[in-house]
Regions:
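Catalytic core of non-heme Fe(II) oxygenases with the double-stranded beta-helix
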Residues: 40, 53-200
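Non-heme Fe(II)/2-oxoglutarate
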Residues: 4-55
Length: 203
């Protein structure tokens, strides 16, 4: 279990290996598949024409993050709970370069009458500098434009390939009184030398 500020994360290792979090068989199967070699290969195939190193990735054997094993890639699936805040907990940013894909599956709760909490995708130039202490938030002088808004809605899924143009964020929730629920599905490198882009941290 990982807790940061107002966000709680339950990792695949907690569910599948350490058995710290009891889940019903449906969720057990969900976590097993979305951290599996089959799913990893499916995602690589989906994005292959956008990945300069996809042939190398196809040859890798994935393991669950935070487990033992000699591999260059890891996968994770996470329950994520964001407590209700009137400001966004995720401004425009780029994910860690060690991540090469990410998916988000939303589970808006019945009775959630808030607005906002939508996933925003932006058009942007290639980003080189980020505020590392602010979660790789991009500088204010970078010109970005709204591209796509994915509503915070039950059973809504969005997936993206991480790059130095994959700028995204979450709109503020208004009148939020219940938690914002989602599942993250992630693929990462274990060695930063494999990353396809770099970000310079700025204060």
């Amino acid at each position: 279990m990982c807790i940061r500020d107002s966000t709680y994360r339950c990792l695949a290792n907690d569910v599948l290996v350490e058995k710290k979090i009891p889940v019903n068989p449906i969720w057990q199967e969900f976590f097993e598949y979305h951290t599996s070699q089959d799913y990893f290969k499916t995602v690589i195939k989906l994005f292959e024409k956008y990945m300069p190193n996809y042939k190398w990735l196809e040859q890798q054997t994935a393991r669950i993050r935070n487990t033992q094993g000699d591999t260059k890639v890891v996968t994770d699936t996470q329950f994520v709970v964001h407590q209700p805040y009137h400001t966004t907990t995720r401004t425009t940013h780029i994910d860690n370069p060690i991540e090469f894909y990410a998916g988000l599956l939303y589970f808006r709760q019945r009775g959630d009458r808030s607005s906002g909490g939508d996933f925003m995708i932006y058009d942007s130039p290639e980003i080189k500098d980020v505020y590392k202490k602010k979660g790789r938030e991009i500088p204010e002088n970078i010109s970005i434009k709204d591209h796509t808004s994915v509503p915070y809605k039950e059973n809504t899924f969005v997936m993206f390939l991480n790059s130095n143009k994959a700028v995204h964020g979450v709109t503020p929730r208004v009148d939020a009184s219940v938690d914002r629920l989602s599942v993250n599905i992630i693929g990462e490198y274990t060695d930063r030398s494999a990353c396809t882009f770099r970000l310079r941290p700025i204060d």
